[in-house]
Amino acid sequence: MASPVQALLLDMDGVMAEVSQSYRQAIIDTARHFGVSVTHEDIDHTKLAGNANNDWQLTHRLVVDGLNGASSAPTLEAVTAQFEALYQGVGNTLGLCELETLLTPKGLLRELHRRQPKGMAVVTGRPRKDCAKFLTTHGIEDLFPVQIWLEDCPPKPSPEPILLALKALGVEACHAAMVGDTVDDIIAGRKAGAVAYGVLTPQTYAKSILEQTPAAIGKVLEQVGASVVLTPGLGELLDLVPAVPTASKAPTVNGKSGVREANISRVTKETSISVKLSLDGTGKSKVSSGIGFLDHMLTALAKHSRFDLELDCKGDTWIDDHHTTEDCALTLGEAFDVALGDRAGIARFGSACVPLDEALSRAIVDISSRAHSEINLQLVRPSVGELSSEMITHFFESFASAALXTLHVDVLRGRNDHHRAEASFKALAVALRTAVKHDATAGVPSTKGVLA
């Protein structure tokens, strides 16, 4: 039986930091400065070969190779200087570092930190100042009292960075896990005796979905020792490193432990709606809204969220679809809010990318009790079936408003509006399923101590 994980060691770039527009762009632009064309695929290929944890050296290698080893090739020092000018910025010109974003939700990182008896460490090939700036910018420096940088020792795939982190955390290798996106990360972790978890970058993950083929890097990471390959955001770590609760308690609704369901009725001069919703179902549904395409979408939502849903609506569809669609969304959102109860013991965050043929949609949910939505479906046709395109967007907005959740839904690509819309509803369903998942160790998943 595997030893329980007591400490997490996280790489930074591609794991916590989105660097496609910063470090990677600096590689491409630096190479261009010296007359060499480098693509993201070239960078991936070089990193896949290993021994590529230092981006200055990696850039120099790509430039020299691109110039076929010519005597006029720049020195490592010259390449490093150009790289740093682009990344850090010069004078009034902002550096590419300003484009970096946090890949892993801050709330998830804090929950993972809470679960680790020995804590968490950053083990990165970044220089100290770049690592510190990113952690401070995103307000997570307190989660990583141990930080191993480029200056500390030989870089991965050497096990030395891992061993230094383990020593500082006071944990045996067999009780620690290294999380990284490159073969160097995995090899270093395994050489040090730790468990190794691979992770796909957002670009690699999106490409694998669009092409409907497994990511090649995932197979390679497994071959060099990764026990599992995670998707961007690291949400699966909640299943891999569960904490032992001191007092396990299922989510409660109005004092009834373990019951997460609601019956809501809404009657106006325009519609009469009843909704019965169970968050712990199997995806059964019985939907009759009076709008065929809306029924189709709500059936898909129930199926892929694993919610049991009964919805019946009598609305003034002889006028148009506005009142019926909006009120169905509001009633369903209210039922969702009531079924959640005090929100204790849930994961809170959920995200999903879901394809439907050529279409790819992404949904991100935060059950925050702060109603907000950003919806971009890129629909072209005036309607899909009897449901107007503007009301498809408005459905998501109304649901988020009544459910008291933050919701982002984006169509990343697609040509067929039916596919765009359906992929969006399915992405929302999968994201909701993750967000409401029972987590006995989470307590109230907010540093405020309340989600209300």
Curated annotation (Swiss-Prot):
Q: Which reaction does it catalyse?
A: D-erythro-1-(imidazol-4-yl)glycerol 3-phosphate = 3-(imidazol-4-yl)-2-oxopropyl phosphate + H2O
Q: Which UniProt keywords apply?
A: Amino-acid biosynthesis, Histidine biosynthesis, Lyase, Multifunctional enzyme
Judged by the first EC level, this protein's enzyme class is: lyase
Question: Gene3D superfamilies, per this entry?
Answer: HAD superfamily/HAD-like (3.40.50.1000), Imidazole glycerol phosphate dehydratase, domain 1 (3.30.230.40), Putative phosphatase, domain 2 (1.10.150.240)
Q: Which GO terms describe its molecular function?
A: imidazoleglycerol-phosphate dehydratase activity; phosphatase activity
Where is region (Imidazoleglycerol-phosphate dehydratase) located? 234-452
Q: Where does the record place the region Unknown activity?
A: 1-233
GO aspect biological process, one term: L-histidine biosynthetic process
Its pathway, per UniProt, is:
Amino-acid biosynthesis; L-histidine biosynthesis; L-histidine from 5-phospho-alpha-D-ribose 1-diphosphate: step 6/9
Q: Which domain of life is it from?
A: Eukaryota
The record's family statement is:
Belongs to the imidazoleglycerol-phosphate dehydratase family.
Matching entries from PANTHER family are given as: IMIDAZOLEGLYCEROL-PHOSPHATE DEHYDRATASE, IMIDAZOLEGLYCEROL-PHOSPHATE DEHYDRATASE HIS7
Q: Name it.
A: Imidazoleglycerol-phosphate dehydratase
